[in-house]
Design a protein with these regions (language model features):
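A surface-exposed beta-strand-loop module
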Residues: 79-146
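Acidic/His/Gly-enriched intrinsically disordered linker/tail segments
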Residues: 325-397
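Beta/coil-rich, acidic/histidine-enriched accessory regions frequently appended to metallopeptidases
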Residues: 27-42, 51-58, 86, 426-577
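Glycine/proline-rich low-complexity spacer/linker segments in large multi-domain proteins
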Residues: 133-172
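N-terminal signal peptide c-region/cleavage motif recognized by signal peptidases
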Residues: 20-21
Length: 577
């Protein structure tokens, strides 16, 4: 149950006081799993603004001799850069009293990095840990997935990884009991349900859970599956209804495609605040979180595509066991592919909207400077540049669309959806969530040609799709395209108050008049430009005391690519879905 409490500053005295509440956690477990009792309290200031998360937990002792206590806090790198969202006011105690900790050090673990605090002595009995993590900067200099701890609509939002500091036994399953404390009239919802929850979880599964806590608005669209519900912080009622209504219809389509029971709970979480102009999403088990900038147009087809993309992640099995980002060709490629084809098949996009989305995908692939690098290489550099991250998404989607067309050309009764569902089924039955399972499905159900095509894609060979790719209503044709190139080195992100440097002599930026030392005065979302074959970029700058607008085509050179068009005159009316 939820525990109402007075709204107040949660200070260090309050944290220490929690160590006196042993009775609350006086449960004895007879099995080998350790009990982990967590209490979460959103911290608010005198103005009732959420400023951080207070965490207190009690961990029962291990029955197996341990090498020593170490607590790990994910740095969120390389996709994010922590700012103010650091561990503060950390206090650890056991049966013998306070446990002193050595200064934290950063350690790498596979593709992730952690701050690690180590105890200076062996611990004894139940372990009590308490600390506070303040909210992150609303507009960080490096914006990756929306998993960081953010204030929105008078509450808190993010993923549990944004604030959890847990023992270093990442694979150990704990018997978790999680409790929320907040004022009456407020609530918390996570990937695991509304309010408190219990279950068996390891650190990785806890980290991945998404949440909203505070004055959360709820909405259940009529006519949808009984398990589908929408929750939001910071979003006006009308906007909430608009985005929820389309999402509910898309969810029904995707749920059926991926064979998810109508009664299975599904939680669509939304956080809206002034955190930059780019809408974004993050998925978890049977849930996903959408970030919307304040005042965002919720009727945009690009938003619908994003929502459909994130739901795909949460309804099928990704290649989560792949090293680093090497599974993103599948994990993100399937999400991009099905977020276009499934809603279109259900009539949720018009023919013109579908065409625009397909050409956006094509531009992200064919105009990408990294388009010829291997999947392994792209995984290592996808967070290094402006549109580098787009490559595994777009290349994976183009590959899957090509595969679907070739299945029809080979007179197969199977579709890519059938192959993906077969892959998910094998993973659910214990197969590794890696390329091996996908290639096993291709070998068993399709044939050598499909394995060859897959290997060519993984090697970075250019994909020029077969006729019928993306359906019969669209026709693809080869064309010459320019490589996306802003023409200057810094800043990587085109953000307000950043100074331009490294303008390339002779580039389109140089020819348009952009100069080293110019100060950008407005943040620009480059994603729609990188997802276009010909959109110009317009950069407002200040040179000395003079404001100026620099406009140019951010592309260079000419290479072979493909674009799509409607199959005949009047196709928007003739193309059935």
């Amino acid at each position: 149950m939820n525990h109402p409490c007075r709204r107040h500053f949660f200070n260090f005295v309050g944290i220490v006081a929690l160590f006196c509440t042993d009775a609350l956690f006086a449960k004895t477990f007879t099995n080998a799993q350790r009990a982990l009792d967590i209490t979460l309290v959103p911290v608010v200031n005198a103005s009732n603004n959420a400023t951080g998360m207070s965490v207190h937990y009690v961990l029962s002792p291990s029955k197996v001799p341990a090498s020593g206590l170490a607590l790990m806090f994910d740095t969120l790198q390389p996709s994010l850069l922590r700012t103010s969202d650091q561990v503060t006011m950390l206090h650890v105690a056991d049966d013998k009293g306070d446990v002193a900790l050595a200064p934290p050090v950063v350690k790498q673990m596979n593709d992730r990095s952690f701050q690690v605090w180590s105890a200076t002595r062996p611990t004894s009995g139940p372990l009590h840990v308490a600390y506070v993590v303040p909210v992150a900067a609303a507009k960080p200099s490096k914006r990756g997935p929306h998993i960081d701890l953010q204030a929105a609509g008078g509450g808190l939002s993010g993923a549990f990884v944004s604030f959890l500091l847990l023992p270093d036994s990442r694979s150990e399953a704990f018997r978790v009991h999680l409790h929320w404390q907040f004022p009456a009239g407020q609530m918390a919802v996570s990937s695991n349900g509304v309010g408190d929850f219990s279950g068996e979880f390891n650190a990785s599964r806890l980290d991945d859970m998404l949440f909203l806590a505070g004055p959360v608005k709820t909405y259940s669209p009529s006519g949808n599956s009984s398990g589908f519900n929408v929750y939001a912080l910071g979003l006006p009622e009308e906007q909430l209804k608009a985005v929820a209504s389309w999402t509910a219809r898309a969810y029904e389509v995707e749920r059926k495609a991926f064979r998810v029971p109508a009664s299975q709970p599904y939680r669509f979480l939304i956080r809206s605040y002034d955190g930059g102009p780019i809408d974004s999403g993050r998925s978890s088990d049977s849930s996903f979180m959408l970030y919307l900038p304040t005042g965002f147009d919720t009727g945009r087809v690009e938003l619908h595509s994003l929502v459909a993309h994130e739901m795909v992640h949460s309804l099928m099995k990704d290649l989560d066991d792949a090293s680093g980002e090497e599974g993103d060709w599948y994990t993100e490629g399937t999400a991009d592919y099905f977020s276009k084809t499934l809603p279109r098949a259900a009539g949720l996009y018009t023919a013109q909207q579908y065409l625009d989305l397909v050409n956006e995908e094509a531009a992200q692939y064919y105009t990408n400077a990294l388009r010829d690098v291997s999947n392994k290489q792209s995984a290592n550099v996808m967070w290094s540049g402006r549109n580098a991250w787009m490559l595994p998404y777009a290349r994976g989607a183009i590959y899957l669309a090509d595969l679907d067309a070739k299945l029809r050309l080979h007179h197969s009764t199977l579709t890519v959806l059938d192959l993906v569902n077969a892959t998910s089924e094998r993973i659910e039955h214990g197969a590794p969530a890696t390329d091996t399972t996908w290639t096993g499905v291709l070998k068993d159900k399709v044939g050598v040609w499909a394995l060859t095509d897959w290997q060519h894609m993984m090697d970075g060979q250019l994909i020029m799709p077969a006729p019928g790719t993306f359906g019969t209503c669209l026709i693809g044709s080869a064309t010459k395209v320019g490589i996306f190139d802003l023409g200057f080195a810094k800043p990587i992100r085109v953000m307000a108050n950043e100074t331009v440097s490294g303008v390339v002599k002779g580039s389109n930026a140089d020819e348009a008049g952009l100069r080293n030392g110019d100060v950008i005065t407005e943040t620009i979302d480059i994603n729609p430009i990188a997802g276009s074959f010909d959109n110009l970029i317009h950069i407002p700058i200040r040179r000395g005391a003079s404001p100026m607008m620099i406009s140019y085509n951010p592309r260079s050179g000419w290479v072979t690519g493909m674009s799509w068009h409607l199959s005949s005159a009047g196709a928007p009316q003739k193309c059935s879905h």
